C-alpha cells in the first residue's frame, strides 16, 4: 500500500475512534427543549415552536454567501493573473461592480438591519442624542 492510502486509512480509524469514545463517555441529557427548533434571536418554549420569525436572518445569510462566493470566484483570477491579461481584469471588475451594486441596493433597502430585541430605556435620562449618551458611559 502507498503512504497516501495508509494516511487516509489511519485518519479514518482515528476519527471513528474519537467518535466512538465520545459516544461512550459524553453525558446524554435529552429533554424536549433540545429537540425544538432553534432560530437565532428567538426563544422557543415547550409547545410554542410555531412562532413567527423574520426573513431578515435568511437575507443576511444569503448576502454572506454571495460575498463569500465573490471571494471564491476572484481567487482564481489572483492566482492566474499573468494569464488573464486585460480581458480577465475587465471581466473581474464587471463582476465586482455587479456584486457591489447589489450590496449597495440591499443597504439602501435596510435589508441588513436586524432589529434588536434588547431595548435600552432612556426615559429617566435626559440626553438629546446618542453620542451624548455614549459620552457619559
Swiss-Prot record:
Lineage of producing organism: Eukaryota, Fungi, Dikarya, Ascomycota, Pezizomycotina
Pfam families per record: Oxidored_q4
Its biological purpose: Core subunit of the mitochondrial membrane respiratory chain NADH dehydrogenase (Complex I) that is believed to belong to the minimal assembly required for catalysis. Complex I functions in the transfer of electrons from NADH to the respiratory chain. The immediate electron acceptor for the enzyme is believed to be ubiquinone.
Ranges that cross the membrane: 6-26, 57-77, 86-106
Protein name: NADH-ubiquinone oxidoreductase chain 3
Enzyme class: translocase
Main location: mitochondrion
Any one Gene Ontology cellular component term annotated for this protein: NADH dehydrogenase complex
GO molecular function: NADH dehydrogenase (ubiquinone) activity
